[in-house]
Swiss-Prot record:
Top-level EC class: isomerase
Entry keyword 4Fe-4S: yes
Motif placement: Nuclear localization signal: 151-167, 871-877
EC number annotated for this UniProt entry: 5.6.2.-
Record's protein name: Regulator of telomere elongation helicase 1
């Protein structure tokens, strides 16, 4: 490797460094040798990470060599070097006054970046150098722990507590192996990143977390996320000693934000209430122990191994402290406009003093809180969520972070540090309320609108000064977007004698930069508040994007100011058809809000760009988002970057307002005007730095090239251009005509593609590892589906998911993929009863129910299960099972059972216990708010659990269903198909539910054509209204001629329609008639059978005499919905099913009894006295009888429909008509799990094709089919 001598230090570099890289390394050495701080900006792609590593490690080796020479000189006492005195060797070892006499005095290097993924890239760069230092990378237990029980804990603080408990009791065998195996060559010598630590730890059965802490003691360079350094609590937890170290912050443009956030907090009513609930539990538990006497108390504490060593009085005092804190916050008067009130930072000490939290008491309070958390660690249940207590501990440590000097009052210390802070108290706007507490200790705060206590730090200098006070030798801040450096240094309030603003290493033909003030249609492009959502601006921006996508090859990045702007733009473009035009050129990928889906989407984008024959892809992201922070879009992955606006912070946000006010106050106090930023300058820099970070994605190395499009007219202003990076400004050009933009960009890429070498193709990492050939096909299928899902806009943009799931627009294949991906609920989940009653049953049976996942479920359910597993990439399998002796999927208990198994698979044991206790509380108290609070914590955070939250709708009590749907939509962007009829009590929704298998949900949709009421012919109408049904009954009893419930003709004539509406008006009144007419019109337009039936059922089932109106409404139901309408009518009217009593399914009279003609008249086969029904039914029957070869086809068709009411007996000689083939047989056979009936021949054909019942999905055998036994007619 080439060697470069800089400032007397020889640096081994992987290649001959460029001039800008030599300049950068020289500045780094200047900081190290002079023990001063530095701010170094070097554009992305200039190799600053490699320069930092090589320079600092070369400097350490130089010091080490000097110390070695000194040791040798001391040992031989100058005999071998008589001409050189010992003092000259010592001066060589002393770096500008440092007293370095031994190897331990050589400074350690602490390399900090924002995330572990960025640190992994840094460690990869280190492996490419010739240096092989001792390396350590620090991480959290969440990332490094391999103990199965600890990993199950949901929260980080619970993992910490349980880990500490196991370490203290020596019950973690991974920790017990650390001392023995930490010196093994494979663990101590190589350069390991976070993944290597976990892999080697699992291989050698040694704890990676404590192994890294051991390696830290001997490491030359330590890698860690920089919140470990900036947060005093984290520094203490990881035992980080900063004295004499060299600290490097890479990607330091985020340091300001992290400094402020690590020293700030927001205390919500939920946090206080959660802490009080936990203390309540401990208090009650210890009180019960005390009542059993001293001997019993010792026995219980010994068996539980809780380690709690607190008096009952101390626990009660701790609860009083929290209650007083809650009262003090609630007592603050707020203005009536919900803006909140702001007080100086010192007010926090007054507020906490009212709750007896002071410098003098903080130690005892923190120790007590820690003991309670340790006491509850590892427990399960609703009261074991100690996150509230942990947050209170963190808050107390932040407020009282600076201990007072001896003899000085604590208030003065507080005043000295609090001028960097503001206290802001504002109403809680979140709907996630804590459940009301009902004990005598509770205050009324939880029953009012809560107040949030915010303690915000507005100066990063508070944390930076604290860092320097730890004895740091040199502090280096570096990034690609720090400009302007002077203002950045002013914010930190510590001296930075060394500054550098480096140019780029690229030539002029590798970068094109243009400001585009107007779109192709001449409309001004602007992301200003008053224009960003205007249709003209959105349309012009969409047209500009489409034109740019035509000329930019391969990957195109589009950055929006915020998520709402991106989502609104996509919504408009999709409505106008613009997104389809762009997708035809380059498929669209959208940056998701949640971190879990991001890697999936970005991998799909990379593969789309790299796929052979592809025109590339478009990636839509937001400034300050995940895609703009250190992600690699080199070469083809990012040939163009479009910035659609200046991403200013929200101007009306209280924190932004107070930050600007704070800076203005600080500037006013400083007599020298240039020593502090003003609020407006800070506001401008926040936008410009976000833009600079986004455009830094385009050039990633020396031979990369690309174009930058600044699509906002405000980029043409001089002040906006002045805040762009120095390497961009020389290439910037403002265009007044969009056509010239396209011409120049096309010319630029033609030249660049000829001049620049082709990029080395990167091998696509296979998702199939060795030894997994057996599942390769499934993995590839999953990956393909995952890619399609990543391309679906609806998946990642909540505003595009507002239409009901299951109704994608015509031709929208991407939307159909979205629906396919998101429908992870099962058909059995959509029933409105049975979950609460099945809790105890589920607890007994769930453990043994994982072996029959697909054997007893319906085909559609099995298909949905397979899809859901594939679409999740095989990360977790949710297997829904039933035992033969258990209720099948169609029953209420079966549906509840399957839902509970899915929930148990998705949640940890602790969270599942919380779920069950919340349900039991809801069952006993009907407390809907408490239920929602629990469900939100369990299912709302993880998008993969949104389907479970939505599926819970079926079990919510009717009077809470509408509220639940609104909350579900707010949290997930999905609705629960609420209809007005869902709010009826269960008894009114279905009078015979207890005796039925369970109501089927009406899923299929139909369309009522325009003017249907005018197209119906009364002459051809089968059931001419209720009077016809009640007076013209069949005289011979032939069921082929007996009208079924709701089975009316296909074309009701205008007289029949008028008669029906007239009867509705007379029976229900004008208001109800208008409501029914409106529902029918809506049914004609939206094709939603659920909606119209909900309205009709609500209107016609209130009184028994109105049930005939429900039946007669069948004249408007189309043929393919007749079976479901029949079943719904039967359920609502309480008609018995087959085998449970016989009653003709015809409308009832005023007394709701069967007409006498049905029970006394001798019924024999024969034509009906009703002419039109006779003609219609006889044609159908004769058609079926004349074509026996079609019976199987007819049967197959009927088998796909839900089970309809069983046919009535036809003759006194026990003859019946099969509903499928319409042939007569002496006996019908019935499914043992439902009311599905067929003749022997039809059952034989069905069982040969499938053993699953077409109606309920139960597994049937020939021996299990039950013969239908009828009472002999009198």
């Amino acid at each position: 490797m080439p060697r470069v001598v800089l400032n007397g230090v020889t640096v081994d570099f992987p290649f001959q460094p460029y001039p800008c890289q030599q300049e950068y390394m020289t500045k780094v050495l200047e900081c190290l040798q002079k023990k001063v701080n530095g701010i170094l900006e070097s554009p992305t792609g200039t190799g600053k990470t490699l320069c930092l590593l090589c320079t600092t490690l070369a400097w350490r080796e130089h010091l080490r060599d000097a110390v070695s020479s000194l040791k040798i000189a001391e040992r031989v006492q100058g005999e071998l070097f008589a001409s050189r005195t010992l003092s000259s060797w010592r001066s060589a070892a002393d770096a500008n006054g440092d007293s370095i006499d031994c190897y331990t005095d050589i400074p350690k290097i602490i390399y900090a970046s924002r995330t572990h993924s960025q640190l992994t890239q840094v460690i990869g760069e280190l492996r490419n150098t010739s240096y092989r230092p001792k390396v350590c990378v620090l991480g959290s237990r969440e990332q490094l722990c391999i103990h199965p029980e600890v990993k199950k804990q949901e929260s980080n603080h619970m993992q910490i507590s349980l880990c500490r408990k196991k370490v203290a009791s020596r019950s973690c065998h991974f920790y017990n192996n650390v001392e023995e195996k930490s010196l093994e060559q494979e663990l101590a010598t190589p350069i390991l990143d976070i993944e290597d630590l976990v892999k080697n730890g699992s291989k050698h059965k040694v704890c990676p977390y404590y192994l890294s802490r051991n390696l830290k003691q001997q490491a030359d360079i330590i890698f860690m996320p920089y919140n470990y350094l900036l947060d005093a609590k984290s520094r203490k937890a990881h035992n980080i000693d900063l004295k004499g170290t060299v600290v490097i912050f890479d990607e330091a443009h985020n340091v300001e934000k992290i400094c402020e956030e690590s020293a700030s907090f927001d205390l919500t009513p939920r946090d206080v209430a959660s802490g009080l609930e936990v203390i309540n539990q401990v208090l009650e538990e210890q009180a019960r122990v005390a009542q059993h006497g001293e001997l019993q108390q010792e026995f219980i504490i010994d068996t539980s191994s809780s380690g709690l060593n607190m008096e009952l009085e101390d626990i009660a005092k701790l609860k009083m402290i929290l209650l007083h804190l809650e009262e003090a916050i609630d007592a603050v008067q707020l203005p009536g406009d919900d803006r909140g009130v702001t007080k100086p930072g010192s007010y926090i000490f007054e507020l906490f003093a009212e709750a007896q939290i002071t410098f003098q008491t903080k130690g005892c309070i923190l120790e007590s809180l820690d003991q309670i958390i340790q006491h509850l660690t590892g427990r399960t249940g609703v009261f074991t969520n100690t996150a509230g207590l942990q947050k209170l501990m963190d808050i107390i440590q932040i407020v009282f972070s600076v201990d007072p000097l001896e003899g000085s009052p604590g208030s003065q210390v507080g005043l000295g540090s609090s001028h960097f802070y503001k206290v802001h108290i504002h109403p809680e706007t979140s709907h996630r309320r804590a459940a009301q507490r009902s004990d005598a200790w509770s205050t009324t705060a939880s029953r009012k609108q809560g107040k949030v206590l915010s303690y915000w730090c507005f100066s990063p200098s508070h944390s930076m000064r604290e860092l320097v006070q730890q004895g740091v030798r040199t502090l280096i801040l570096t990034s690609g977007t720090l400009a302007p450096l002077s203002s950045f240094a002013l914010e930190m309030q510590i001296p930075f004698p060394v500054c550098l603003e480096n140019p780029h290493i690229i030539d002029k033909n590798q970068l094109w930069v243009g400001v585009i003030p107007r779109g192709p249609d001449g409309v001004q492009l602007s992301s200003a508040y008053d224009k960003r959502f205007s249709e003209e601006c959105l349309s012009s921006l969409g047209k500009a994007l489409g034109n740019i996508a035509r000329v930019v090859p391969h990957g195109l990045l589009v950055f929006f100011p915020s998520y709402p702007v991106m989502e609104k733009s996509l919504e408009f473009w999709q409505a106008q058809g613009m997104s389809k035009k762009v997708e035809a050129l380059k498929p669209l990928f959208v940056e998701p809000r949640n971190k879990g889906s991001f890697s999936e989407v970005i991998d799909a984008y990379y593969q789309q760009v790299a796929s052979p024959g592809s025109n590339g892809a478009t990636f839509l992201a937001v400034c300050r988002g995940k895609a703009s922070e250190g992600l690699d879009f080199s070469d083809m992955n990012g040939r163009g970057v479009i910035v659609t606006g200046l991403p200013y912070p929200p101007r009306m946000d209280p924190r932004v307002i107070l930050k600007m006010q704070f800076l203005d106050e600080m500037k006013g106090r400083s007599r020298v005007g240039g020593q502090c930023l003003s609020g407006q300058e800070w506001y401008q820099q926040q936008a410009s730095r976000a833009v600079n970070q986004a455009i830094g994605r385009v050039i990633r190395h020396r031979h990369d090239y690309g174009a930058i499009f600044l699509c906002d007219h405000r980029f043409a202003y001089a002040d906006a251009r002045a805040h762009l990076p120095s390497w961009v400004r020389p290439y910037l050009k403002v265009y007044d005509n969009f056509g010239r933009v396209i011409r120049d960009v096309a010319q630029f890429f033609r030249v660049a593609q000829k001049a620049m070498p082709l990029p080395v193709p990167q091998a696509v990492t296979s998702s199939v590892s060795e030894g997994e050939a057996a599942v390769k096909e499934a993995t590839l299928s999953s990956h393909s589906l995952s890619t399609r899902k990543a391309m679906s806009l609806d998946v990642h943009v909540p505003s595009l998911r507002r239409r009901p799931v299951g109704l994608p627009t015509a031709g929208d294949s991407e939307s159909s993929v979205c629906v396919e991906y998101e429908q992870q609920t099962f058909s059995a989940q959509k029933r409105p009863m049975g979950l609460l009653a099945a809790l105890e049953y589920n607890e007994q049976k769930a453990g043994a129910s994982e072996e029959q996942a697909l054997s007893s479920s319906t085909p559609s359910l099995r298909c949905e299960k397979r899809l859901s597993v594939e679409q999740r990439g095989g990360k977790k399998k949710v297997r829904l099972v039933n035992h033969p002796e258990e209720p099948v999927a169609g029953t209420q208990a079966g549906r509840a059972k399957m839902f509970m198994v899915a929930v148990k698979q998705a949640l940890s044991q602790a969270n599942f216990d919380t779920f069950t206790q919340a349900l039991q509380h809801y069952k006993s108290s009907d407390d809907f708010e408490a239920l929602v609070a629990s469900l939100t914590c369990l299912f709302a955070e993880d998008p993969k659990k949104h389907t479970l939250l939505k599926g819970f709708y079926q079990f919510v009590r009717p009077h809470h269903k509408q509220q639940f749907e609104d909350i579900c939509f707010q949290l997930t962007g999905q609705r629960c198909s609420y209809q007005p009829g869902n709010s009826l009590p269960f008894g009114e929704q279905a009078q015979s539910t207890a005796s039925k298998q369970g109501r089927r949900e009406l899923e299929s949709k139909l369309t009522l054509s325009e003017g249907a009421d005018r197209q119906l012919d009364p002459g051809e109408h089968l059931n001419q209204g209720w009077p016809h049904l009640s007076t013209h009954l069949t005289s011979k009893g032939d069921t082929s001629n007996c009208p079924k419930v709701g089975c009316v003709g296909e074309k009701p004539g205008q007289p029949a329609v008028n008669d029906y509406l007239s009867d509705v008006h007379k029976a229900l009144g004008s208001a109800s008639c208008n409501q029914l007419t409106a529902a029918l019109r809506a049914y004609k337009q939206d094709d939603d059978l659920d909606k119209v039936l909900a309205v009709v059922a609500a209107l016609t089932t209130a009184k028994p005499e109105h049930l005939s109106l429900l039946q007669r409404f069948g004249m408007f139901i189309r043929r393919h919905h007749k079976p479901r309408f029949v079943q719904t009518c039967a359920d609502l009217m309480g008609l018995p099913t087959i085998g449970k009593g016989l009653e003709l399914p015809c409308p009832r009279d005023e007394s709701t009894t069967v007409p006498s003609e049905l029970t006394h008249e001798d019924m024999k086969p024969g034509p009906s006295t009703s002419k039109k029904p006779e003609k219609t039914q006889s044609k159908i029957s004769s058609f079926l009888r004349q074509r026996p070869d079609q019976s199987a086809r007819s049967d197959d068709t009927i088998m796909q429909l839900p089970p309809r009411l069983p046919p009535e007996h036809t003759t006194s000689q026990w003859n019946f008509v099969c509903p499928a083939c319409a042939t007569e047989d002496t006996v019908l056979f019935q499914c043992p799990s439902c009311d599905f009936c067929r003749c022997r021949a039809c059952w034989q054909r069905q069982l040969q094709a499938s053993r699953l019942c077409p109606a309920c999905g139960a597994v049937n055998r020939k021996q299990s089919i039950a013969q239908v036994i009828w009472p002999k007619p009198q």
